[in-house]
Amino acid sequence: MLALHEQYPERYPVLLDSSAAGRPLGRFTLLLAGPEGRLLLDQDRRLHGEGNGDHFCDRLDAWWQRERGPAPPAPWPFAGGWFLYLGYELASEVEPSLRLPPSPLPVVALAWRMRAALLHDHSSGATTILAEPGAAGVAERLRSDLQAIGPAPGPGPIGAAGAIVEDEPEQYLEACRAALAHIAAGDVYQANLARCWRAPAPEGVTPAKLYARLRAANPGAFSGIAGFDDVAILSSSPERLVRVSGRRIDTRPIAGTRPRLASGDAASIAELTASAKERAEHVMLIDLERNDLGRLCEPGSVRVDEFMAVESYAHVHHIVSNVCGQLRDDVTPGAVIRALFPGGTITGCPKVRCMQLIGDLEGKGRGAYTGAMGYLALDGSLDLNILIRTMTVRGGEVELRAGAGIVADSDPLHELDETRAKARGVLRALGSTG
């Protein structure tokens, strides 16, 4: 699938990939095909493309209502619909009172019509091509391209990416201390602060080749690569923002992190699960997500069906829970985005005040980082990740970010170390040995 994306990016611009083998959450990989119309929100907050109206989510809902159709055949999740990219600064539309720094990317949000897909089921090993009515030609072209394509790019060595420049540590420590002052004053309870790394893109290396290295160095259940408007988004995210399947909705918050150590996992996991700080932060964010789902769901249907499980990834251990509910019949995809975006685990609590504080303390737009990407199917099903463990390639430069949640008893130096642990796998894709 990655080979098709690399060779024919105009026909197959998006791969939604589960690169974490053996994890039940990332069951399907989807190569989206047949790109057509678009709805785009630019960095000047102007809307382009499909529909009328002043808001991205409203236009998306109107477009979906016009095009909606039946669910795809079981067990497949997609047989036509939309690719969705939601940059972090879409938060300014979701919460109009926010005044955030501008996005560093030309596209803040994108809904891109896709008429077909090549899908692989990691559970059964089956692969199929599905297309919506009227898109048989797209499916036939996909079938022909699949038969003729060469091997996918592998995670082999690349030339040096050039010097990797890390944001000044003291700048981050100062932001942490400022956040702690706000917490002590009762302004917020928790705030997720991020920092940035930049490097020249490795010469002669395509985004697909770089993505192959990323998913090998840092596998994630909600990975993917998307190319549009001279930007490539490469993600190896472990975190789901939201899934809607039928009338069931799930969100899966991650909060609580420890690095994996060469000496073994047991001590690190024991410290993580015993930490009163990490447990309190996690429970607070579960409550935030329950509140978000409560705005959408039938009364009494919201519940936590997985509580504080530990998941181990290539470079870190995380505490993870799952919150689910039964959607009301009147809830639309745009309403789901408005209620849950951006994710509470990468903003803080209370969410709106935290987003304003993050903008003030970080001082620059986040772009793709802590936004979301995924699909919306014709029947209203959707699946979106949170864009963490993600790099952006644009204009010959690669940028990535990592953050940590600041709470009352945070140690700024520990939080600085946590950002480095989270960034480690992404940096290794660029050739870093740290």
Per-region residue spans from a language model:
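Extended alpha-helical targeting/anchoring segments
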Residues: M1-G434
